[in-house]
């Protein structure tokens, strides 16, 4: 006799959700929709670094600001409310990051089309012959 298979992929399973508490709701909902039990146990808290602790960063000398995540966008903007100089190009590592920039009224100048993440960024032609440019990576 063959065992019956549940229509819900996660039925009877417990899933540990380690995302920050304010970011876990969507994942918890998806787990529960598939019959799983979500155990919320945030292991990190994401906080902004005070702009005074950034050291010698000078926006006027920056050519590229590279954001690697939605959290990077949110925390950077909390700590740096001033507008960016017009010459600074904003780079998003993926679609979620780009969306976070747009939600804050910013224009994404560069984003990998096919591959999300730093690997996709490094494959872009703009990064192949870069010289005399200051790149700030926000993570």
What are these regions (language model features)?
Residues 2-139:
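Signature of uroporphyrinogen-III synthase
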């Amino acid at each position: 006799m063959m065992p019956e298979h549940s229509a819900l992929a996660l039925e009877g399973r417990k899933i540990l959700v380690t995302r920050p508490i304010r970011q876990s709701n969507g994942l918890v909902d998806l787990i529960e929709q598939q019959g799983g039990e979500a155990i919320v146990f945030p292991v990190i808290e994401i906080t902004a670094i005070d702009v005074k602790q950034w050291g010698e960063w000078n926006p006027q000398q920056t050519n590229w600001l590279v954001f690697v995540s939605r959290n990077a966008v949110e925390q950077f903007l909390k700590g740096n409310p001033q507008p960016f100089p017009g010459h600074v190009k904003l780079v998003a590592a993926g679609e979620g990051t780009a969306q976070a920039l747009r939600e804050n009224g910013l224009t994404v100048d560069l984003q990998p089309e096919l591959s999300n993440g730093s690997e996709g960024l490094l494959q872009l032609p703009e990064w192949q012959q870069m010289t005399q440019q200051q790149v700030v990576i926000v993570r």
